[in-house]
UniProtKB/Swiss-Prot annotation:
Gene Ontology biological process terms from the UniProt entry: actomyosin contractile ring assembly actin filament bundle convergence; conjugation with cellular fusion; mating projection actin fusion focus assembly; mitotic cytokinesis
Compositionally biased tracts (Polar residues): 324-345
GO CC annotations, alphabetized: cytosol; formin-nucleated actin cable; mitotic actomyosin contractile ring; nucleus
Organism: Schizosaccharomyces pombe (strain 972 / ATCC 24843) (Fission yeast)
Annotated region (Disordered), positions in chain: 1-24, 296-345
Protein name as it appears in the record: Uncharacterized protein C4H3.14c
Signal peptide start and end residues: none
Positions with biased composition (Acidic residues): 304-323
Length: 345
């Protein structure tokens, strides 16, 4: 049942209590009336009937008519009062029965009231639990809403950051393309400048030709040594049964040819190593020049036109100096190699 039903039941119980109290008062009143009638009846019987015949009546042998009428009247009144008393007794019994019924109904209603109070307490506790659960759920929902709001704000910030990074990436790609184009242009200019320097440097051409002649001379020498070894080997085979002196001469010639071949091969190996070292130095110088050109490219992007021209001239002069240094080292190495070959020959 709900709260309204319990309140209605309480009101009905109060009405029953009031009815019981009213009935109690009525019963008490009727009981008092019955007691009064009984007392009056007893008094009348004791006065007129239980008293007996008076002495003057016995002497005369007669009664006054008024006394008989009075007795009859009193008897009638007593009968009437008895009937009234019986009625009152019946009513009293009925009222007692009603009182018992009302008390039973009251007890039932009290039991129902207690049950309703227990149900009300249970419902109240359940409502309180529901309210607490609703408050907790509301708090959790508010926390989720706050987290969702924070995530949405963070998502918006990330979108803005992504857009900014994309714009920066596009700008960086554009700048990179421009730098690549500038680099290609500078490399082309550097190649043209290097070719121009090589073209206008007769000493370098002469050294290259000298190196080619040296290689040809070494090749001819090795070819001659191989042919001499073959020529010396043929009479050795033909004169297997000749004297020991001839064999020793031939063996000595072969040993000398082998030693000469070893010396030439070792010299050529050393010469090739020196040549590779010189070429590595030249490559390093060229790479340094390219790095300086890259630095010049970066510097060109940040400096004014007038300053760029001065720096460009300085870097070109330094590059020419490095190339001249490499060429001079290469020429020195070639000259020393030629001298060594001539001394060995």
């Amino acid at each position: 049942m709900g709260l309204e039903g319990s309140e209605k039941l309480e009101h009905e119980i109060e009405q029953v209590h009031d009815n019981i109290e009213n009935r109690k008062e009525e019963v008490s009143t009727l009981q008092d009336m019955a007691n009064d009638l009984e007392k009056l009846t007893d008094h009348i019987e004791a006065t007129y009937i239980g008293r007996g015949v008076p002495h003057d009546h016995a002497k005369t042998g007669s009664r006054k008519p008024s006394s008989g009428q009075l007795i009859a009247t009193m008897q009638n009144e007593i009968d009437r009062l008895k009937k009234e008393g019986d009625k009152v007794s019946i009513l009293l019994m009925q009222e007692r029965k009603k009182r018992k019924e009302l008390e039973s109904a009251k007890n039932n209603l009290l039991n129902v009231y207690d049950s309703l109070k227990m149900q009300k307490a249970s419902v109240s506790s359940m409502v309180n639990r529901k309210q607490r659960a609703a408050k907790e759920e509301q708090k959790i929902q508010e926390e989720f809403e706050r987290q969702i709001t924070d995530l949405l704000e963070e998502q918006q910030q990330l979108k803005l950051e992504i857009e900014r990074l994309e714009a920066e990436t596009e700008r960086a790609n554009s700048e990179t393309e421009q730098y690549e184009k500038q680099k290609e242009a500078l490399e082309e200019e550097y190649e043209e400048l290097r070719n121009e320097c090589l073209k206008h440097d007769p000493q370098l051409d002469a050294e290259i030709r000298t190196l080619q002649d040296t290689f040809e001379e070494v090749e001819r020498t090795l070819t001659k040594q191989v042919s001499d070894a073959k020529i010396a080997d043929k009479p050795l085979k033909d004169s297997m049964f000749n004297s020991n002196s001839e064999k020793e001469k031939i063996m000595h010639a072969l040993e000398k040819a082998e030693k000469d071949a070893d010396i030439y091969s070792e010299f050529i190996q050393q010469y090739m190593e020196q040549l590779e070292s010189s070429l590595e130095k030249s490559s390093t110088a060229i790479e340094n020049a390219q790095n300086r050109l890259a630095e010049m490219t970066a510097h060109l992007a940040e400096s004014s036109d007038y300053d760029n021209d001065d720096d460009t001239d300085g870097i070109i002069n330094e590059t020419d100096y490095e190339l001249d240094t490499s060429q001079s080292e290469f020429a020195t190495l070639t000259t020393s190699s030629n001298k060594s070959i001539l001394n060995e020959s």
